[in-house]
Amino acid sequence: MVVGGGGEGDQKRSSGEMMAMASLFNDQQNPIQQFQVKFKEVETNFKTWLSKQSIPVEAAVVSTMSGVQGAFIGGLMGTLSPEMPQAGVDPQAIASMKQAQALVGGPWVQARNFAAITGVNAGIASVMKRIRGKEDIESAVVAALGSGFAYSLVSQGLQGQPMNAITTAAGFAVFQGVFFKLGERFSKPSTEDPFFTRGRTMLVKLGLEKYEKNFKKGLLTDPTLPLLTDSALKDANIPPGPRLMILDHIQRDPEIKGKRK
């Protein structure tokens, strides 16, 4: 009985030391890495919350956020745009440049234009994605048509000719369609392995996402997480510090720990 009690005490002491070392290792993480992990966590939680809202609410939130970003970019571009030279320039060239400058406008005008383009585009794209359940060229073209009309409306007002608005919207749609197709052609679709979803989430939360390849090479799939041991992680070539953090996280996570029983 005494021997059994001593063994149990040693096991608890060893577990406590492991948790303390994991906590110390976690505290010594790079602050930039910690910020990135927290940012990803907040972003994931926000996207999860947004996906549960109604279509009008999601469209309003996405349009507002994208519009603010567009206004900032447009204002910055308007502020940094070079001044028009006056001396030694042909008068006809100056007149043409003045017309172009009047069309583009200063920081406030560009902020307004970019806010309309990005806000409407993002809002329509979110609605199309919720309705169609995917992001495709049709959704991109419809969103571009809407942003083209919005740009024409805010830049020319109700006095602009309808044909100009149609031409602008069509130009936006063609450009967006070509850009979407080029993106599809040159980018490789990232297919997430469903057997490593929980493990990937855990590694990102701990700031250890670079060891995802080790998990895949060692076939440490989601069903094996409750069974993980130090030797199994060592066989997957994961260093001692990250091993302690992973085991500590599994021990603290009630959902993973509960599957051991």
Curated annotation (Swiss-Prot):
It comes from the Eukaryota. Disruption phenotype: Plants lacking both HP30-1 and HP30-2 are yellow to pale-green and impaired import of CEQORH in chloroplast inner membranes. It is found in: Plastid, Chloroplast inner membrane. Gene3D superfamilies: Transcription Factor, Ets-1 (1.10.150.50). The keyword Zinc does not apply. Pfam families: SAM_1, Tim17. Keywords: Chloroplast, Membrane, Plastid, Plastid inner membrane, Protein transport, Transmembrane, Transmembrane helix, Transport. Coiled coil: none annotated. The chain crosses the membrane at residues 59-77, 113-129, 139-155, 163-180. One of its GO terms (cellular component) is mitochondrion. It is a multi-pass membrane protein. GO terms for biological process: mitochondrion organization; protein insertion into mitochondrial inner membrane; protein targeting to chloroplast; tRNA import into mitochondrion. Belongs to the Tim17/Tim22/Tim23 family. Together with HP30-2 and HP20, triggers the import and insertion of transit sequence-less multi-pass transmembrane proteins (e.g. CEQORH) into the chloroplastic inner membrane. Probable component of a protein-conducting channel made of HP30-1, HP30-2 and HP20 that mediates the import of transit sequence-less proteins into the chloroplastic inner membrane. Interacts with CEQORH. This is Chloroplastic import inner membrane translocase subunit HP30-1. It comes from Arabidopsis thaliana (Mouse-ear cress). The lineage of its organism: Eukaryota, Viridiplantae, Streptophyta, Embryophyta, Tracheophyta.
